[in-house]
Amino acid sequence: MDDNKKKSLDLALKQIDKAFGKGTVLRLGDKEIEPIDSISSGSIGLDIALGIGGVPKGRIVEIYGPESSGKTTLTLHLIAESQKVGGVCAFVDAEHALDVKYAKNLGVDTDNLYISQPDFGEQALDIVETLARSGAVDLIVIDSVAALTPKSEIEGDMGDQHVGLQARLMSQALRKLTGVVHKMGTTVVFINQIRMKIGAMGYGTPETTTGGNALKFYASVRLDVRKIATLKQSDEPIGNRVKVKVVKNKVAPPFRQAEFDIMFGEGISKEGEIIDYGVKLDIIDKSGAWFSYDNSKLGQGRENSKAFLKENKAIADEITEKIRANMGDSIMSGAVDEEEMEGDE
């Protein structure tokens, strides 16, 4: 750069610093790029699939899927993991449906969880913005986008048309929120539901998420949660097998996926993941129905082995560390169909 250009640039940078504060514009080479902090999801496989050990701090995250697929369970695990390391968390319960007893079972410190049950969408999003601006809250969960009903719709008569109101509300709120959460280091997680596109035919998925396209654009991470099987013991349902696809990821390679068990009343089965990934990585030996580790038997059958690991936390932690150290892309990578990527460009 010649001297005249350098002088002009230096003058411009001084004017910007004076107007907006020192460090508003930085040259990347002047400062070491720091790794992105994360909050664990509570799932070993999903943490690795996300590429940075969990969901990124200071970003907007969308978790979506059909009803009863495990979306709220996943967010409660995020809250529990954040609280374990001293994080302050808030739950904006727009659906007025939070099960406090279930949250406790998952490890959430409900006594120190801030909760709000707003009357309408604008109030909910104002609460989220105010909490984020405080800089004191690490994680905010909104359950759910579909329940963020605009005030005019609530106060209107049944049958009134309110086309696009919620989409405009979300678009306006996210434009304001994105910069705030990044500056303050607050993670904001939106739970969203799936709807069928009206008149969808031919190419592409007939599914879409509620609240318009703004959240798809502003979210740094989008997780698609699906139930793939019901877990049974003696013909009695005891949980669900769930697959989570990372369909968008701005902080690590996308399109990875993870599978894990969600047990009724207990949440994500970490012991089940330890066995699954331990066997895949040859850390745990499987011979017939027996599972063993380091020449010691864990149990006969998956459920008995899970019970052993739950009772022997030191062994479970040891295997977990080996899994995290040895987990490779070959296990976690899973291509997402092009039609499922639609709208994420």
Curated annotation (Swiss-Prot):
One GO CC term on file: cytosol
Localization in the cell: Cytoplasm
Main localisation: cytoplasm
Recorded name of the encoding gene: recA
Keyword DNA repair: yes
Coiled-coil intervals, chain numbering: none
Residues that, per the record, bind ATP: 65-72
Function: Can catalyze the hydrolysis of ATP in the presence of single-stranded DNA, the ATP-dependent uptake of single-stranded DNA by duplex DNA, and the ATP-dependent hybridization of homologous single-stranded DNAs. It interacts with LexA causing its activation and leading to its autocatalytic cleavage.
Pfam families named among the record's database cross-references: RecA, RecA_C
Molecular function via GO: ATP binding; ATP hydrolysis activity; ATP-dependent DNA damage sensor activity; damaged DNA binding; single-stranded DNA binding
Family statement drawn from the similarity comment of this UniProt entry: Belongs to the RecA family.
Single biological process term from Gene Ontology: DNA recombination
Source species: Campylobacter fetus subsp. fetus (strain 82-40)
Keywords of this entry: ATP-binding, Cytoplasm, DNA damage, DNA recombination, DNA repair, DNA-binding, Nucleotide-binding, SOS response
Protein name in the entry: Protein RecA
InterPro entries: AAA+_ATPase, DNA_recomb/repair_RecA, DNA_recomb/repair_RecA_CS, P-loop_NTPase, RecA-like_C, RecA-like_N, RecA_ATP-bd, RecA_C_sf
